[in-house]
Amino acid sequence: MSFRKTHPLIKIVNSTLVDLPSPANLSVNWNYGSLLGLVLVIQLITGIVLATRFSGHSDMSFDSVISIYQDSNYGWLLRLVHSTGASFFFLFIYLHIGRGLYYGSYVYPEVWNIGVLIYLILMGTAFLGYVLPWGQMSYWAATVITNLLSAIPWLGPTMVEWVWGGFAVGNPTLTRFFALHYLLPFVVTALVILHIFYLHIYGSSNPLGISSNTNKVSFHYYYSVKDLYVYFVFFFVFMVFTLKYGYVFMDAENFIPANPLVTPTHIQPEWYFLFAYAILRSIPNKLGGVVGLLLAVLVLFLFSVSTSKLLFSGTIYSPLARLLYWSLVSNFFLLTWLGSCPAESPYNEVALVATVTYFTFMLTMCALPHISTYLYLKS
């Protein structure tokens, strides 16, 4: 037998990337997973290198970022690659989740739930990284988001002080945020390996939404070459954004050192959190806003409930499901835009309506496969 099939370590890679049986009809929509793996590697490498020159101290953090730009060889490039990579990471995550919803990938509960868990941890990791440069937006975003814990009855105020390490966001907060931002990507990497492990046990979905057990092809060369082509396209677009538009995803306020005495006119997170931020702001009650913020993501877990009994999944053969799906996508874009708008009328009222429709579309899409299966069996 071939060496790659007998060596105890190489054969694991072989079964994952070479001889993996794959559906013969996978489209470009199935490339986002491999792109996410590539971006994760880029983020890990650039993050570890940047950590060697970064100082997680409130007095030196902002200056250390400037030092990385000015005093380190290609430090400016590493920092821009890392910050731009975060935006591309979440872009591919949303496309990956969107493809999963459209084609019914939630019928594999273990794969789906681990994926949603990865998304949750990545949201936390990205938020921690947003705080590290210790600019104005970093400081006040940390203050606003950590203050949400105070909405928890009884324990809230104590938990806020515990997270802060004092009575306000300061050096202890930054130090522990830096430590967590460094460690969490390795947790994500472990979950990604588990995600791929379960994916290879249950198999992949496909554009037709039917079993592909009778029509499989080897992953290499067919899909490995296809992935390489997409990698080249990604690298071209990624480097254009990094080198020509490197600051387009950054907030101008974050180029000002953190000042606890001056509040920015408009506090907002990065673009990939704006939809959740709009939901948080749209609900007048503080606890209600926090619950809405959590449910905006946790609602994805509902899709994997009782999927073993489903005869229909995804939107492929249902015009109503497709209408709901694209309405949800439009609603997501609307919430993202509203999250970047000032917290005033009429944006608050529109955001509240968009929040209600977001959960309506989500819950209806979640229930529709079960309703369709019930009506089919009843008839």
Curated annotation (Swiss-Prot):
Intracellular or extracellular location(s): Mitochondrion inner membrane
Residues reported in the UniProt entry to bind a ubiquinone: H200
Necessary cofactors: heme b
Entry's cofactor comment: Binds 2 heme b groups non-covalently.
Positions that bind heme b b562: H82, H181
Membrane topology type: Multi-pass membrane protein
Keywords: Electron transport, Heme, Iron, Membrane, Metal-binding, Mitochondrion, Mitochondrion inner membrane, Respiratory chain, Transmembrane, Transmembrane helix, Transport, Ubiquinone
Residues that bind heme b b566: H96, H195
InterPro entries: Cyt_b/b6_C (IPR005798), Cyt_b/b6_C_sf (IPR036150), Cyt_b/b6_N (IPR005797), Cytb/b6-like_sf (IPR027387), Cytochrome_b (IPR030689), Cytochrome_b_N_euk/bac (IPR048259), Di-haem_cyt_TM (IPR016174)
Bilayer-spanning residue ranges: 32-52, 76-98, 111-131, 177-197, 223-243, 287-304, 320-340, 348-367
Gene3D superfamilies reported in the protein's UniProt record: Cytochrome Bc1 Complex, Chain C (1.20.810.10)
GO molecular function: metal ion binding; ubiquinol-cytochrome-c reductase activity
GO terms for biological process, alphabetical: mitochondrial electron transport, ubiquinol to cytochrome c
UniProt GO cellular component terms: mitochondrial inner membrane; respiratory chain complex III
Keyword Mitochondrion: yes
Presence of keyword Glycosyltransferase: no
PANTHER family: CYTOCHROME B
Function: Component of the ubiquinol-cytochrome c reductase complex (complex III or cytochrome b-c1 complex) that is part of the mitochondrial respiratory chain. The b-c1 complex mediates electron transfer from ubiquinol to cytochrome c. Contributes to the generation of a proton gradient across the mitochondrial membrane that is then used for ATP synthesis.
Subunit comment: The main subunits of complex b-c1 are: cytochrome b, cytochrome c1 and the Rieske protein.
Family: Belongs to the cytochrome b family.
Descriptive protein name: Cytochrome b
The species this protein was found in: Brachionus plicatilis
Gene this chain is encoded by: mt:Cyt-b
